[in-house]
């Protein structure tokens, strides 16, 4: 049985949104060059759920601004998780619903299935994301870099 791979909430600089300054998604970090992304893309009238391998390491994505580890998942569970997250209803034409709303719903669902740490909730995520954004601004290591350097345990 393989060790669980880290599951993080990743944040990216977002421009032009009426209320948000970061786009969020969930990322399973398989290796330094291999990740799997779960997210809602689009705008309020076109939101779409996407689950796919990411062809570029996180630290090479120009808008990436760090993240926080929320859990761990077995690599063989990626298809199951992709299917589970695809069941989250997508709300269109409602300005109060966006990618951050979807990520919080996804965390709750994955927590109920045992893939997310017990202490993780929305305030936990927001606090850790702010901390990692500050690290990024200071050119310090972001969560993915810390996880890869330590073999899977974020500090």
List PLM regions with ranges:
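Non-catalytic ligand/cofactor/substrate-binding and regulatory segments of enzyme domains
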Residues: 1-97
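Activation targets extended, charge/polar-rich intrinsically disordered C-terminal tails
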Residues: 86-155
């Amino acid at each position: 049985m393989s060790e669980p791979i880290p599951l993080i909430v990743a944040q990216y600089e977002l421009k032009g949104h009426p209320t948000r300054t970061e786009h969020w998604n969930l990322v399973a970090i398989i290796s330094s060059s291999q990740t799997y992304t779960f997210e809602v893309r689009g705008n309020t009238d076109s939101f779409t759920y996407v689950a796919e391998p990411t062809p570029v390491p996180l630290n090479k994505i120009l808008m990436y601004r760090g993240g926080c580890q929320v859990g761990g998942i077995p690599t063989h569970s990626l298809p199951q998780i992709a299917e589970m997250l695809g069941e989250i209803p997508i709300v269109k034409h409602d300005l109060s619903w966006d990618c951050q709303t979807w990520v919080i719903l996804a965390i709750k669902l994955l927590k109920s299935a045992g893939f997310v740490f017990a202490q993780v909730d929305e305030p936990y995520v927001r606090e850790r994301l702010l901390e990692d954004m500050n690290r990024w601004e200071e050119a310090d290591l972001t969560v993915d870099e810390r996880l890869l350097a330590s073999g899977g345990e974020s500090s």
